[in-house]
Amino acid sequence: MLSEEIRQLFLEFFEKKGHKILPSASLIPDDPQLMFTVAGMVPFKPIFWGKVDPVYPRVTTCQKCIRTTDIENVGRTPRHHTFFEMLGNFSFGDYFKREAIEWAWEFVTQVLKIPEERLWISVYEEDEEAYDIWRKIGVSSNKIVKLGKEDNFWGPAGPTGPCGPDTEIFYDTGKEVPITDGKEPNPGNTEGRFVEIWNLVFTEYYQDENGQLLPLKRKNIDTGAGLERIAAMMQGVYYNFDTDLFLPIINRITDVLNVEYGRDEKHDVSIRVIADHIRALVFLISDGVFPSNEGRGYILRRILRRAARHGKMLGSEKPFLHNIVDAVVEKMGKIYPEIVEKQSFVKEIIYGEEERFLQNLNKGLDIVDKIVKETGGKIDGEAAFKLYDTYGFPLDILRDLANENGYILDEEGFNKYMEQQRKKAREAAGEVEFSERTDYETLDISTKFVGYDVLSTNARVLKIRTEKFVDEVKDVECELILDETPFYPEKGGQVADKGVIKGKNGEFVVTNVYVPVEGIIVHKGKLKGKIRVGDAIFASVDEKKRKATARNHTATHLLHAALRKVLGTHVRQAGSLVAPERLRFDFTHYAALTKEEIEKIEKMVNEKILEAIDVNTKVMSYDEAIKNGAMALFEEKYGDKVRVVRIRDFSEELCGGTHVKNTGEIGLFKIISESSVSAGVRRIEAITGFASLTYLENLETNWKKIKEELDATDENVFVKIEKLKEGIKQLELKIKEIQKNMINIKQILNNVQIENEIKYLVYEFEGVEQNTLRDLADKLIDRGVDLVVFFNKQGDKVILIVKRKKTFEKLHAGNIAKSLSKILDGGGGGRPDFAQAGGKDVSKINEAKSKLIEILREC
């Protein structure tokens, strides 16, 4: 049975049981505590947590998921994956254990027709109710294994929250494996033989701060069945990679790389890694994740680099992953149309990123070789971090190299350096460590945001948090939750408001505002004085900063629209930062913008500012907004009701941020830089309002200084610059002539040596023009020298020139230059008769000279 049929049968089965079929949610969850959607229940987490009422009491999905915690096992084991599909059925306060168990058994035995003798069950050792249900539907007691909390009890996700026992269905593959306790093999004592195909979680408790389990008013069902595992079971194979979900991709890999699958285990591991990782790459990029050095983008980059390295291990020396994309789309595009829509774009991103990485990989591998030679096979934490930070060399690739070659890798030291860097980045960005905020999910409170209409309001303190929730604080850094607030929290690329919260006995300076869970707005800052839960306060936003941020946010919308009009509709937002001082906008585009394009975009935005257009906002249904032409952004999540920001017929986007009421308030828009973020993603940084005025004033000041230095006017300043350039050019020519005259060919010829019947000459120079040395090398060859090697020091770098007699074919100048430059921590090469290279380590020139003699002796 093919995977398409399994997927369809599952969804249709539960639809007949009264479930609503919902499409897969994005891999980017609407949850600040999660990097990716890691399970089928993630989109329903607010319902399980009691924060949101369900629209449907029963739903069923096939959810695309990403997990990278065990990435080093992918390809080496039968069932580890980064990207996978999870089939699931969910009940929100509707049916419970009996129906969940009966329907799961019915689907497996009657729809999939798996022989009952091949199935085993595990239950939580204290869950007699689940055990009795399994017995009543006919499962014999010797096929039910009672396991402890570690195996059959789910949650909570943090110290507190919903949780409950679970029961699992296992498939017996019949594989002969060792038994841990000497008894009959079962899922509790045997590794590798029994495959878990379905987990049924009964969320019936809430664990409080004391670890006590309290019964939930609304009990829920959360089940998950891995499609890849079920496909392997139905297709009679042990490895998920041998199913129809992977074989078409594996076949494309073997065709592209000209390798065979199934003959060499080491090669097979690499092929399986690539097959798994390319699926993850296609789906992540299609869902709006782009390569970067932080967050989701870093995980994407890590997956891509790992796949690229395994390609290199299979003999690939150039980008190839983009050629595998079509196989993924052909296999899964009918189920997930978003990967068809983004197919070309995904290939562009993958190609560019892989091309860059391969360039750095080769440099990194050379450095690793150098390190292990010098240290006897040890890579310390500082060296590992430098490889990562300077060359983008991932730790998992270093780990693979260490495992393959027996090197000692100091991961603990690397992690210390890495954490130092992350701490600096967090401090610079004011980032909130959401992983430490799980206790906010326990709160049954909410904050009303009033900041669209007012910048100050009276409110009441609902909660105070330091390390934990407290009733009163004095003179500390802490976090406050109010019943209502004018402070806009950091989200959607817009930075949080700053300002002050004043109480009767204290003043709280707000430094950051964020949303740890839906409906709660947290104010982070420093308190001078006292404040208590229940206090009446006055919350006031910094008006100057808010207005500057609003100018930049509306300008970002104008910029987005202008980019699409000038460059094309392929342009999509790929990230943004909207702050009071500036705006940063990342967008999808394949090439650097020309000077003319930048000028055209800037002019278009300023025209809309001068037109003084009203900026309108309206709340409507998501479907209505999209139908009306509003743009939804890649990474943003939207509820049933959305806020649409419209600037006449020029721009219309879904956006929850703060904006000016009229474009005229922006004043002036000025692009200050355009650059590359990653393959296929460009970045524009710009300023507006008073910041652009200050920028222009600085330009004018510098312009006046230039005129003063040149004793010039507006009319003749460029004429004077041209005269200066011409004068410099003439002086450079004179310097070259002087250098030529200073070089004594006869004196240099005294340094000719003979090795292995080869007349060679090695000479060091400092700061000599390269063309002068090339001419000199030609003259020395004409004087009968077989090989000329020049080391030309340029500050802390060195340029290498290698020239040989054209008829002297047993020497190859390009290969010599390549070997010597590697010692000098550089690179280069060239033709058999002439080559040029560079190096960064002038202290290794003598070592390079010794290497040259070795090369000559071996000729």
Swiss-Prot record:
<dbReference type="InterPro" id="IPR018164">
    <property type="entry name" value="Ala-tRNA-synth_IIc_N"/>
</dbReference>
<keyword id="KW-0820">tRNA-binding</keyword>
<dbReference type="Pfam" id="PF07973">
    <property type="entry name" value="tRNA_SAD"/>
</dbReference>
<keyword id="KW-0030">Aminoacyl-tRNA synthetase</keyword>
<dbReference type="InterPro" id="IPR018162">
    <property type="entry name" value="Ala-tRNA-ligase_IIc_anticod-bd"/>
</dbReference>
<comment type="function">
    <text>Catalyzes the attachment of alanine to tRNA(Ala) in a two-step reaction: alanine is first activated by ATP to form Ala-AMP and then transferred to the acceptor end of tRNA(Ala). Also edits incorrectly charged Ser-tRNA(Ala) and Gly-tRNA(Ala) via its editing domain.</text>
</comment>
<dbReference type="InterPro" id="IPR018165">
    <property type="entry name" value="Ala-tRNA-synth_IIc_core"/>
</dbReference>
<dbReference type="InterPro" id="IPR002318">
    <property type="entry name" value="Ala-tRNA-lgiase_IIc"/>
</dbReference>
<dbReference type="InterPro" id="IPR018163">
    <property type="entry name" value="Thr/Ala-tRNA-synth_IIc_edit"/>
</dbReference>
<dbReference type="GO" id="GO:0005829">
    <property type="term" value="C:cytosol"/>
</dbReference>
<keyword id="KW-0436">Ligase</keyword>
<keyword id="KW-0479">Metal-binding</keyword>
<comment type="similarity">
    <text>Belongs to the class-II aminoacyl-tRNA synthetase family.</text>
</comment>
<dbReference type="InterPro" id="IPR023033">
    <property type="entry name" value="Ala_tRNA_ligase_euk/bac"/>
</dbReference>
<keyword id="KW-0963">Cytoplasm</keyword>
<dbReference type="GO" id="GO:0002161">
    <property type="term" value="F:aminoacyl-tRNA deacylase activity"/>
</dbReference>
<dbReference type="InterPro" id="IPR009000">
    <property type="entry name" value="Transl_B-barrel_sf"/>
</dbReference>
<dbReference type="Pfam" id="PF02272">
    <property type="entry name" value="DHHA1"/>
</dbReference>
<keyword id="KW-0067">ATP-binding</keyword>
<dbReference type="InterPro" id="IPR012947">
    <property type="entry name" value="tRNA_SAD"/>
</dbReference>
<dbReference type="GO" id="GO:0000049">
    <property type="term" value="F:tRNA binding"/>
</dbReference>
<dbReference type="GO" id="GO:0008270">
    <property type="term" value="F:zinc ion binding"/>
</dbReference>
<dbReference type="InterPro" id="IPR003156">
    <property type="entry name" value="DHHA1_dom"/>
</dbReference>
<feature type="binding site">
    <location>
        <position position="659"/>
    </location>
    <ligand>
        <name>Zn(2+)</name>
    </ligand>
</feature>
<keyword id="KW-0648">Protein biosynthesis</keyword>
<dbReference type="InterPro" id="IPR045864">
    <property type="entry name" value="aa-tRNA-synth_II/BPL/LPL"/>
</dbReference>
<dbReference type="InterPro" id="IPR050058">
    <property type="entry name" value="Ala-tRNA_ligase"/>
</dbReference>
<dbReference type="GO" id="GO:0006419">
    <property type="term" value="P:alanyl-tRNA aminoacylation"/>
</dbReference>
<feature type="binding site">
    <location>
        <position position="655"/>
    </location>
    <ligand>
        <name>Zn(2+)</name>
    </ligand>
</feature>
<dbReference type="GO" id="GO:0005524">
    <property type="term" value="F:ATP binding"/>
</dbReference>
<dbReference type="GO" id="GO:0004813">
    <property type="term" value="F:alanine-tRNA ligase activity"/>
</dbReference>
<feature type="binding site">
    <location>
        <position position="557"/>
    </location>
    <ligand>
        <name>Zn(2+)</name>
    </ligand>
</feature>
<keyword id="KW-0694">RNA-binding</keyword>
<keyword id="KW-0547">Nucleotide-binding</keyword>
<protein>
    <recommendedName>
        <fullName>Alanine--tRNA ligase</fullName>
        <ecNumber>6.1.1.7</ecNumber>
    </recommendedName>
</protein>
<dbReference type="Pfam" id="PF01411">
    <property type="entry name" value="tRNA-synt_2c"/>
</dbReference>
<keyword id="KW-0862">Zinc</keyword>
<feature type="binding site">
    <location>
        <position position="553"/>
    </location>
    <ligand>
        <name>Zn(2+)</name>
    </ligand>
</feature>
